[in-house]
């Protein structure tokens, strides 16, 4: 018996491995895997149902059909183990060998492997340097190919048609060798000398100058070198032996009624075997060439279909007209091996049911129906029953449980105690979609869920279902309790704010409780404390809202950090005093002494967590919930039709709007305004009217008149139920109330355009038929959008996870001094995001100096906490350089300091944290909240866009950066620089507002001057771009020839005449070469020089420029010489929402991107062509100038002779991230992508920490292009992993050799995922065939570094608790020990894991 157990144990041992290599299989290798040749297409005998000998299910080749029993039944039982039966030839062993033993088919004629032939670029074609078309013609027997030319004039690899071949035969006889079919290609491949070929190609590469040729050569060299290094032989891409899959992986299942269901592979194999056998027979018979050829072609097609059906020609279909599933289809796609069985599996010990509310549960509990618990915990119950001696055998225990005896329930109670279960709600968009709870047994059949975790699950109780999973092993239970317990997940990993926040009823209850009311019962009482407040409220002596004085004792930390009690009498209300009783000691009373809305409650929980830690916060959250529910019930807030008060002014506002619309209609009919203007104006009028109605309604709703104690009427905030719900943040918003009691307003058509007749009614009044019909548009579009959005958002998340999955924190500090500058996000006059929110939880990259001094406020490498951020705010620091993952120098993974704080835990991140996946989830999860729309800017919006002045909002000092200006005669500044920025600094030196000042603006006040709020500081004309002179003097026209380069126009209304420069297209012959310009000369007629240069002041005029000056007039510096009208680009579509985020992460180039200056220098224009202008930038140091052709229709923002910096905008448009990376560097592109993505999310009110976006950007910047190879193996122009190049360079530097240089590339997330080092990860993402083909040819090794690869091979992932295991393996490998397969007892494992978890200081998980 003992050796039987030993034998069974030995069977389960897995082999330890460090990496997985994929390569081409040689024929000998295939034969070595095989256990015999499959010679017949038969499967099983239809009478006996036994497998046919030598057939596809042959027992002699693949193993016995029944355990330890040969086919003919001579040997049965275990004692004959390993005997081979002499009658039927079957080895006596377990049946499961039929899952692993392979067979093979000896092909009568070689066939090409379709993957290496047809998967683009064709590997065979690239290797032979022949077009795919030609190779196919050879393979499918249409033409001959010359294998050896011999002494003839035929080239090797030359293609010959039938006639040419016959001619050549006549001419040369057997001096040359030409064949057709796969034999020919095989011979060509076999005869290749790879090393020799490599040499010649490298020589060619050094000599050639053509870019396309270089690219082609580089590709071939890479492929050839891959073959040389991997030890693959090219001729192995042609199959001579075909492996046969083990039969249990392509089963034949008998159905009832004598029919069989079979895997498609069997059909495909049968075709191959039939054709192969027929071909063998024909060859033996020496059949005519044409018949053999046809058979060979058919064999080639059969093998193609088996390997990848439908890749070439029409897919082979089965009896039901469906294409057969080939081997390639088995592994690719959502239903393929990778995504269906390896990355996600169905699990046992799980159940699902509908969820209902459990308002009495504690945060760490969930209600589990008894029926479910009994089923899920069965094995544990059986074990306990046997242990107690209540059942003798498992069978008896089973019976007891089935009968549901009383004792079983007691045992279930014991088993369940302290055994957490996991609850999951699909779709699991982020890690908080699976959390652990302690089950509480309940009657009924629905799972009860704690209301506070609904936000994390995005669950509601309208019929949602959830799944329960039971962690079985001790380790799993420990992880569930320490890491996944709902009490340990209070903060959201996306933004570090509490996610366990009360919503809806609870918020309403707390809001109602903390409101105050004038002249309520019991006003003016003085109470001894919260207890008394509760007593008099219960006794009915005072109202909840009564304003009273209460004696309050607070615990406050003094300057030394000790807790001291402080007692004072506070003006407050009864309700707030009662609420104070549940607030944990250590928080100030001021936190509840205000009407509590949703934001205030969230802030209160956040403060509690930061000051007191995890445990008090969890208890507090529960208490808040119970109290909130109780007082929401007492408040009796309800919705009645009388709560929707329609403002009295509504009718007159609408009437006014209608008269305005009628006026515009009249103007339109008399031709004063165009149709477009009329439409825009009408929409503006109605939008304004809607706003006015809404304002009147809210003023009406939000206050009510009351009589106070002295009998005086005063106003107080309203107790209207609907208003309270919206004001507290419990449900609804001003926009929704507007539709109930104001007017519904303008509606959009499905294409996004606005219908100009608004719905003037609201829901309180009711809609008429037309209004109802107009409303249906929007409602339907909403539903259709939601469906699309969910799919798109899920796909975005999948791509993000895939690109970032292998990014893990691997060391504490990489020691870099680089980082990115963080400044507050300021748009116009508002601070969109203050500095503290952007730097909180980051590590400083440099010392932060106190402004105006040399004192160090915060040293470098300090994690910025709330306290430090307060310090920064007090000292009004307005920019901080922080460490970032983008500039982290760790080779594989990132370091903890560059990442900073773990947002979900509030301390610096632990090693082994999978930050890539967290980032992907944080960005993808809110994706469903983003819109799918592209916004048409029309009407109100576009008019706001054409601003013409800057009006500051606050008092402060002006600060101008990158500015050039001249003073005009009036003593005002005229701006002559392009990207001038204006900041408003307050008295503490903080930036309050930030504006772009366009070229040609006139400013009344300059740099460093004081301004008051509301003052206008700059003006400009938004419709034209001026040409400003920087010097004074007299105008001299140059090349301004009437009728050739200019034309004179006279305005009919004013009688003024002006000159308009003609576009080069409009000029006649001689005018084409003239370049109209305005020169400035002094009184003597000599050129005036531009100050600071030796260039004469002359201003070249582009086409369409308007000049309103005459020759010889005197002008002053800062005057406008000419105006260039700006074409208003109609209604522009702004891509918003989800598609915009996807475009940014895919790094797509915009349609007409901004043109940036490639180098710094002076602008000039060279010779023009028909449709393009030649822009020349000459560097100031006199090195080579840069030229670029720019289409004429692009508007340029630069004039001749202007100096630009590298990366400046030359022509406006959306910027391309690739250009930003090339010209302004990694940090600029990071900033660009981060800001643009944040913009989209900010519009929806979603907060995501910048870190997450930076993590994705780091992954997009993984690759670089080699500029010069130095002493490395790399080829110039090849794309390589940046970390690999850096490692190679470090080695070279140590040896004192030349290092390689490279430029960073920005890849979109899909491309970056496919370009990852790990072929397993890439293959399981997209384009499986292409990835595997490429990897096999190159003989790639997958080092199993990422998470995905390890999940696929069935290991612990190298992150989280699996990180230690992987570190241990690496250490052992480095020391040359053999890694032991851990045989750990459960107790040891628990101890180790506990130690590991404590080391990661994960906060206290003591849920009592």
UniProtKB/Swiss-Prot annotation:
Originating species: Serratia proteamaculans (strain 568)
Organism lineage string: Bacteria, Pseudomonadati, Pseudomonadota, Gammaproteobacteria, Enterobacterales
Subunit structure, as described in the record: The RNAP catalytic core consists of 2 alpha, 1 beta, 1 beta' and 1 omega subunit. When a sigma factor is associated with the core the holoenzyme is formed, which can initiate transcription.
The protein's name in its UniProt record: DNA-directed RNA polymerase subunit beta'
GO biological process: DNA-templated transcription
Gene3D superfamilies in the record: 1.10.132.30, 1.10.150.390, 1.10.1790.20, 1.10.40.90, 2.40.40.20, 2.40.50.100, RNA polymerase II, clamp domain, RNA polymerase Rpb1, domain 3
InterPro entries xref list: DNA-dir_RpoC_beta_prime, DNA-dir_RpoC_beta_prime_bact, RNA_pol_asu, RNA_pol_N, RNA_pol_Rpb1_1, RNA_pol_Rpb1_3, RNA_pol_Rpb1_3_sf, RNA_pol_Rpb1_4
Record keywords: DNA-directed RNA polymerase, Magnesium, Metal-binding, Nucleotidyltransferase, Transcription, Transferase, Zinc
Source organism, top-level taxon: Bacteria
């Amino acid at each position: 018996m003992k050796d039987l157990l030993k034998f069974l144990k030995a069977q389960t041992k897995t082999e330890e491995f460090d990496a997985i290599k994929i390569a081409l299989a040689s024929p000998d290798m295939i034969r070595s895997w095989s256990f015999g040749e499959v010679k017949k297409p038969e499967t099983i005998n239809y009478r006996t149902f036994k497998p046919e000998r030598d057939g596809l299910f042959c027992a002699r080749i693949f193993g016995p059909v029944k355990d330890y029993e040969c086919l003919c039944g001579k040997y049965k039982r275990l004692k004959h183990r390993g005997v081979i039966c002499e009658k039927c030839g079957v080895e006596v062993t377990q049946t499961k060998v039929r899952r692993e033993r392979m067979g093979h088919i000896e092909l009568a004629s070689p066939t090409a492997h379709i993957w290496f032939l047809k998967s683009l670029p064709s590997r065979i074609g690239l290797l032979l340097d022949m077009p795919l078309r030609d190779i196919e013609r050879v393979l499918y027997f249409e033409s001959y190919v010359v294998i050896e030319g011999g002494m003839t004039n035929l080239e090797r690899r030359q293609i010959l048609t039938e006639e040419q071949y016959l001619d050549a035969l006549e001419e040369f006889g057997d001096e040359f060798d030409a064949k057709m079919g796969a034999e020919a290609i095989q011979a060509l491949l076999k005869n290749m000398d790879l090393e020799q070929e490599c040499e010649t190609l490298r020589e060619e590469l050094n000599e050639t100058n053509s870019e396309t040729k270089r690219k082609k050569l580089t590709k071939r060299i890479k492929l050839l070198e891959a073959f040389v290094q991997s030890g693959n032989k090219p001729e192995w891409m042609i199959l001579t032996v075909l492996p046969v899959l083990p039969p249990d992986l392509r089963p034949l299942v008998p159905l009832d009624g004598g029919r069989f269901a079979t895997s498609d592979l069997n059909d495909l194999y049968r075709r191959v075997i039939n054709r192969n056998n027929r071909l063998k027979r024909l060859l033996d018979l020496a059949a005519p060439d044409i018949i053999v050829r046809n058979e060979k072609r058919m064999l080639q097609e059969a093998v193609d279909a088996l390997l990848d059906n439908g890749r070439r020609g029409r897919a082979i279909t089965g009896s039901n007209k469906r294409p057969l599933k080939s081997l390639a289809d088995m592994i690719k796609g959502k239903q393929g091996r990778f995504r269906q069985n390896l990355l996600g599996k169905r699990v046992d010990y799980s159940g699902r049911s509908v969820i209902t509310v459990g308002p009495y549960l504690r945060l760490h509990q969930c209600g589990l129906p008894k029926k479910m618990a009994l089923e899920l915990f069965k094995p544990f119950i059986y074990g306990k029953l046997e242990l107690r001696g209540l059942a003798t055998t498992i069978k008896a225990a089973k019976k007891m449980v089935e009968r549901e005896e009383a004792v079983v329930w007691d045992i279930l109670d014991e088993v369940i105690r302290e055994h957490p279960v996991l609850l999951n709600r699909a779709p699991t968009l982020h890690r908080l979609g699976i959390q652990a709870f302690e089950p509480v047994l309940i009657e009924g059949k629905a799972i009860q869920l704690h209301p506070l975790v609904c936000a994390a699950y995005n669950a509601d109780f309208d019929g949602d279902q959830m799944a329960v999973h039971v962690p079985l092993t001790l380790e799993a239970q420990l992880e569930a309790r320490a890491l996944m317990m709902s009490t340990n997940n209070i903060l959201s990993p996306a933004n570090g704010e509490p996610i366990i926040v009360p919503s809806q009823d609870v918020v309403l209850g707390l809001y109602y409780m903390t409101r105050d009311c004038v002249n309520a019962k019991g006003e003016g009482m003085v109470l001894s404390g919260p207890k008394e407040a509760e007593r008099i409220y219960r006794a009915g002596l005072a109202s909840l809202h009564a304003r009273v004085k209460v004696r309050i004792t607070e615990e406050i930390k003094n300057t030394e950090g000790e807790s001291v009690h402080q007692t004072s009498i506070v003006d407050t209300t009864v309700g707030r005093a009662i609420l104070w009783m549940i607030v944990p000691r250590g928080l100030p009373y001021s936190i509840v002494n205000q009407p509590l809305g949703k934001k205030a409650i969230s802030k209160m929980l956040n403060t509690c967590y930061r000051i007191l830690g995890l445990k008090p916060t969890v208890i507090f959250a529960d208490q808040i919930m119970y109290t909130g529910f109780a007082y929401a019930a007492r408040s009796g807030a309800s919705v009645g039709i009388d709560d929707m008060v329609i403002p009295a002014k509504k009718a007159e506002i609408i009437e006014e709007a209608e008269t305005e619309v009628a006026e515009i209609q009249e103007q339109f009919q008399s031709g004063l305004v165009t149709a477009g203007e009329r439409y825009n104006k009408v929409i503006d009028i109605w939008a304004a009217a809607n706003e006015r109605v809404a304002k009147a309604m809210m003023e009406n709703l939000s206050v009510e008149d009351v009589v106070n104690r002295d009998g005086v009427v005063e106003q107080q905030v309203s107790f209207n139920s609907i208003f309270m719900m919206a004001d507290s943040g419990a449900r609804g918003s001003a926009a929704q109330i507007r539709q109930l009691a104001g007017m519904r307003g303008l509606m959009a058509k499905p294409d996004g355009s606005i219908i100009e007749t608004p719905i003037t009614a609201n829901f309180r009044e009711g809609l008429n038929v037309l209004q109802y019909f107009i409303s249906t548009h929007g409602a339907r579009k909403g539903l259709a959008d939601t469906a699309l959005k969910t799919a798109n958002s899920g796909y975005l998340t999948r791509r993000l996870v895939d690109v970032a999955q292998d990014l893990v924190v691997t060391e504490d500090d990489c020691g870099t001094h680089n980082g990115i500058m963080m400044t507050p996000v300021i748009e116009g006059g508002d601070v969109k995001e203050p500095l503290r929110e952007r730097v909180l939880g980051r590590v400083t990259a440099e010392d932060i100096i106190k402004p105006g001094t040399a004192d160090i406020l915060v040293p470098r490498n300090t994690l910025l906490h709330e306290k430090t951020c307060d310090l920064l705010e007090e000292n009004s620091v307005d920019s901080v350089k922080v460490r970032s993952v983008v500039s982290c120098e760790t080779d594989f993974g990132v370091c903890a300091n560059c990442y900073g704080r773990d947002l979900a835990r509030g301390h610096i991140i632990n090693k082994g944290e999978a930050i890539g996946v967290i980032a992907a989830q944080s960005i993808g999860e809110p994706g469903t909240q983003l819109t799918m729309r592209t916004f048409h800017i029309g009407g109100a919006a576009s008019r706001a866009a054409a601003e013409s002045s800057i009006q500051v909002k606050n008092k402060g000092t002006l600060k101008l950066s990158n500015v050039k200006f001249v003073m005009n005669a009036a003593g005002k500044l005229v701006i002559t620089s392009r990207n001038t920025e204006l900041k408003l600094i307050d008295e503490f030196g903080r930036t309050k507002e930030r504006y772009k000042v366009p070229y040609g603006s006139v400013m009344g006040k300059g740099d460093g001057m004081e301004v008051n709020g509301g003052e206008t500081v700059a003006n400009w004309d938004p419709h034209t771009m001026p040409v400003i002179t920087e010097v004074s003097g007299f105008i001299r026209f140059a090349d301004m020839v009437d009728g050739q380069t200019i034309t004179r126009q006279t305005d009919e209304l004013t009688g003024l005449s002006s000159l308009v420069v003609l576009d080069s297209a409009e000029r006649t012959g001689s005018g084409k070469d003239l370049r109209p310009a305005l020169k400035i000369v002094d009184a003597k007629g000599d050129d005036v020089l531009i100050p600071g240069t030796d260039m004469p002041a002359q201003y070249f005029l582009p086409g369409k420029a308007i000049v309103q000056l005459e020759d010889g007039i005197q002008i002053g510096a800062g005057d406008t010489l000419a105006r260039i009208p700006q074409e208003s680009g109609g209604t522009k579509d702004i891509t918003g929402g989800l598609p915009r985020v996807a475009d940014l992460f895919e790094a797509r180039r915009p349609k007409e991107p901004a043109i940036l200056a490639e180098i710094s220098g002076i602008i000039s224009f060279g010779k023009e062509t028909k449709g393009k202008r030649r822009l020349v930038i000459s560097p100031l140091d006199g090195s080579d100038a840069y030229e670029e052709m720019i289409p004429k229709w692009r508007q340029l923002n630069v004039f001749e002779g202007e100096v630009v910096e590298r990366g400046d905008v030359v022509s406006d448009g959306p910027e391309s991230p690739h250009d930003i990376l090339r010209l302004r560097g990694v940090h600029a592109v990071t900033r660009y992508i981060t800001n643009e993505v944040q913009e989209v999310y900010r519009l929806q009110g979603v907060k995501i920490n910048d870190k997450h976006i930076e993590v994705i950007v780091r992954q997009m910047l993984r690759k670089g292009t080699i500029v010069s190879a130095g002493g490395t193996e790399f080829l110039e122009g090849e794309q390589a992993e940046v970390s690999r190049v850096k490692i190679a360079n470090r080695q070279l530097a140590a040896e004192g050799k030349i290092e390689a240089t490279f430029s960073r590339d920005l890849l979109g997330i899909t491309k970056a995922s496919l370009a990852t080092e790990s072929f397993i990860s890439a293959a399981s993402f997209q384009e499986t065939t292409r990835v595997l083909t490429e990897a096999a040819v190159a003989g790639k090794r997958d080092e199993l570094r990422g998470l995905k690869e390890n999940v696929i091979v069935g290991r612990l992932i190298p992150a989280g608790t699996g990180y230690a295991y992987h570190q241990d393996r690496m250490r052992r490998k480095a020391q040359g020990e053999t890694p032991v397969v851990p045989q750990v007892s459960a107790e040891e494992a628990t101890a180790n894991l506990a130690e590991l978890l404590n080391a990661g200081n994960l906060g206290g998980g003591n849920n009592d």
